[in-house]
Amino acid sequence: MFFLFFWGSLELHTFLDALELIKALKPAQPVTLDRPQAATRAAKFFVDRFPGKSLYAVKANPSPDLLRVLWASGITHYDVASIAEVRLVAETLPDATLCFMHPVKTPEAIAEAYNTHGVRVFSLDCHEELDKIVEATGAPDDLTLCVRLRVSSEHAELSLASKFGTELSDARDLLMATRQAADSLGICFHVGSQAMSPHAYVQALDRVRAAIVDASVTVDVIDVGGGFPSAYPGMQPPPLEDYFAIIDRAFESLPISYSAELWCEPGRALCAEYNSIVVRVDRRRGDQLYINDGAYGALFDAAHIGWRFPVRYLGDTRSSTLADYSFFGPTCDDIDFMAGPFPLPADIKAGDYIEIGMIGAYGAAMRTGFNGFGSSEHHTVGDEPMQSMYTGEARQHWRADNVVSINR
């Protein structure tokens, strides 16, 4: 059974699951499925268990509907990386606290963020950016400035170690200069996306300790950034509680102000489970399936970095025997290809539907209209995501796997 809700001229559908949706709609275009309950659970998990303040990294999924779900679940601070994101969150959530955490900003963006949208938190990784912020804001006395330190991404699936961050050898002078310009001084870093070990944060916080000792400055904020992982096929990270515990211990041992705050910037961890997508098979060629979404749609990561997403056939008349497939997207471009492997029924054929899960992070956000393809149709479903970091079963599964590997 599905339900219809009317809000002005907007008709919203809530379905039990993807199977009910395709039976009712038989969609010819890709359909993105929203799971507000999954985002609510993730947000409350961070609000209740992370030993500090959680800032949602808007770039991971800037959906206004998602932003409202996170706000209602206790996420009050937002990591914005462009003036467009500043405007979006300010319009959607007028009472939210915005933190402009991109280390390279235009003077115009800084000035608008400060003067129009009330942004008081900015990040930087060089003296030029510090001078730019001070000049664009008029050298006020209410700035929180976070110096971004370069740290290793060795434990992450996607490195973020080369583009931003001051080297430890240069941090002393920058921290001292920033301390003079800031009401509150912070240090931030990013261990890389999808960090598969909590020890990534230990190593990073060791560098933070060295920077503080060398500069001999009072630090008011430690921002451990993002990197908190989600579960995908072939990637089952440790429980998030393990990350929180190890960060808390390292934070408490730092030589910082007694009233210093601990921040984090989860993106993927808050939104990966929020979305899946329903696609239709347009053609089968051996073990290759031509589907109606791809590299220029919600499956950018599956194509360009070989990310594997969970898949399931939507129907009840196909073989129980599975075979591995790769996908071609709908465009005319050869790189619109996702190697997988994606396990699906051995007798799948054109006209069948597939649900691809865990695309809430950097899925819908990366969608384009290239080659005339793409769909913005969304519907809400009430079932659980295909994988989760927030159920006892997922955490138990990881611990069981670990015991087996240790005893071998």
Sequence positions of predicted segments:
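Solvent-exposed alpha-helices and their adjacent loops that cap or buttress functional pockets
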Residues: 91-93, 114-115, 137-140, 156, ...
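Active-site-proximal flexible loops/turns
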Residues: 66, 86-89, 109, 132, ...
